[in-house]
């Protein structure tokens, strides 16, 4: 076995683990190529969060920009590293008023899963791939459809109030969704 190339595998520059103390919460969207589905869900999530939290960022939010402490990213299990978003995905985003500019495809790496507080996948196969990477990802990895269904069943009054911070509320939401898994039909 050899050590991974720089920029590959487990990163050394970021030591904070998922769900740990910190003022950011990372959402990772995963699909196959990271040129269509996951870029769409990433950018729509950023757009909705910026709208909901009242953050106006000229030119949109770039990858890694925090919106109220929330960082939204994406990667692909067979990611087209460095590839642009597909044209039809850009059209979908434009139709919803979201910014498609500046996107660059990424291959899913261990460090992405390690740093993510919430992983949302396009399919159950993607979820299985993320979980098989290890890193205690099972309780924070959901298909987008599954997470949506679970979140709709959570009473917002059971979550920390927004004045305690968006990040704490997001962490509590993921814990509540994980706890509901297997209980809802």
Predicted features by range, described:
Residues 2-116, 125-128, 132, 136-139:
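Conserved active-site segments centered on acidic
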Residues 2-5, 17-19, 131-185:
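Phosphate-binding/catalytic loops
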Residues 123-126, 173:
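Bulky hydrophobic/aromatic packing residues
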